[in-house]
Regions:
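Cleavable N-terminal export/targeting peptides
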Residues: 1-13, 127-128
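Short, P/G- and charge-enriched loop/turn segments at secondary-structure junctions
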Residues: 13-14, 137-140, 192-195, 285
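Outer membrane beta-barrel
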Residues: 15-34, 45-176, 200-205, 209-216, ...
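Outer-membrane beta-barrel pore domains
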Residues: 40-43, 84-88, 109, 118, ...
Length: 376
């Protein structure tokens, strides 16, 4: 975590007020998405056209053991508070975070800011409204950044040639309706429903990671993450998310791999035959469990001011679906991405990418992104 934080901090170029121990930083990305093969239906399949992502962050140092961070984000969902928390640090091995933050889960959320990753959109397991057909799929496995209220205890231990990180946390967790079939992400950012836990029961999670120094400019990192809880108001519908990630830095070449899986319990209701597309199995049992998993494989290679990126990612959903859903009992989408990021002035980058979506339930789609992103 600290290795990543140092890289991000160096790339973000914050404005620092040494006298007051304050840091101010931010980033902006303007991206244009088009679906050239089906331009007439693009608005119904995703957020085609221009979208902007803005983040503004203020960090305040109150001394050796206490800091505060506040971050405001603006994107397609409007203005949101991306973080507002205190860090109470005893030493490297023990830090307590309280407030509103992104809990430690997976690798990509550490670099979710558009200024810190080279593609215009996020990997499919972490999608937050940018993938084609995101409404039909109801996003990925866990949208990033996942922002929530709660408490986290984390720390880092340094040993010869290695760095060990851990985190455990309790947060409000994802939300859904009574009798729901999946998470309803609008409930987590709707002022009408309040920014509070919907069932009074915390969601808990943990992460453990290791980074190994393999020599000059060579680092191997790996991590495991988990999160579990209930998402309905009655706290009867449970979920479990597990993830594994690995990355390898070889001089200036970066290779990343990540896998996420979520098991979600859903309500079958009083009349499942009318509600769901598929009936009971041959044994007469109607399953109330769905599986949603996804993967992401990436390689980045810079050549001076130009960085080439190749990405292969995908999603799968298995389990019953609503009778009105266009998905099947097992639905899959694979995406192939070729991207170029060009440093045009300072840390400002021009991002371009071509993505091929291979759907099991819809026509395949070609998506083209062109955008500009940078920190300040």
């Amino acid at each position: 975590m600290l290795l990543v934080a140092r890289v991000v901090a160096a790339d973000s170029a914050p404005i620092q007020d040494r006298a007051a121990n304050r840091n101010f930083a931010g980033s902006i990305q303007l991206d244009y998405l088009t679906l050239p093969e089906h331009p007439s239906v693009a608005p119904t399949e995703g957020f085609a056209g221009a979208t902007v992502e803005l983040s503004l962050k203020l960090a305040m140092d109150f001394g050796e053991h206490t800091t505060a961070n506040v971050k405001v984000c603006y994107a397609c969902h409007g203005f949101e508070v991306g973080m507002a928390y205190f860090d109470l640090r005893y030493n490297d091995e023990l830090n307590v975070r309280v407030g509103r933050f992104t809990p430690s889960f997976g690798s990509f959320p550490l670099r979710h800011d558009p200024a810190n990753h080279m593609t215009s959109d996020k990997p499919l397991p972490y999608d937050m409204g940018r993938m084609v057909r995101f409404r039909e799929w109801n996003e990925g496995v866990l949208p990033a950044p996942w922002v929530d209220n709660g408490i986290e205890v984390n720390g880092t231990h340094f040993v010869s040639g290695a760095q060990l990180d851990y985190a455990v946390y309790a947060i409000g967790g994802p939300k859904g309706n009574a009798g729901g079939i999946d998470f309803d992400y609008t409930l987590s950012r709707s002022g009408e429903r309040y920014y509070v836990d919907n069932n009074g029961e915390p969601t808990v999670g943990a992460r453990a990671a290791i980074a190994l120094d393999l020599g000059p400019r060579r680092v191997l990192s790996a991590g495991l993450s988990t999160m579990a809880g209930h998402y309905d108001p009655a706290a009867k519908l449970g979920f479990l998310i597990a993830g594994a990630d690995a990355s390898l830095q070889l001089d200036r070449t970066s290779l990343r791999a990540e896998y996420l899986a979520r098991w979600t319990r859903f309500a079958t209701g009083d009349d499942p035959a009318a509600t769901f597309k598929y009936g009971p199995t041959a044994s007469g049992r109607l399953s109330s469990l769905s599986l949603r998993d996804g993967f992401d494989l990436e390689i980045e290679q810079p050549f001076g001011p130009v960085t080439l990126i190749a990405r292969w990612d995908g999603l799968r959903r298995a389990g019953n679906v609503l009778a009105t859903s266009p998905l099947r009992s097992t639905s899959i989408v694979l995406r192939y991405t070729a991207a170029v990021a060009i440093r045009i002035a300072g840390a400002l980058r021009l991002k371009t990418s071509v993505e091929r979506y291979d759907f099991s339930d819809f026509e395949d789609e070609l998506a083209v992104h062109v955008g500009i992103a940078g920190p300040f």
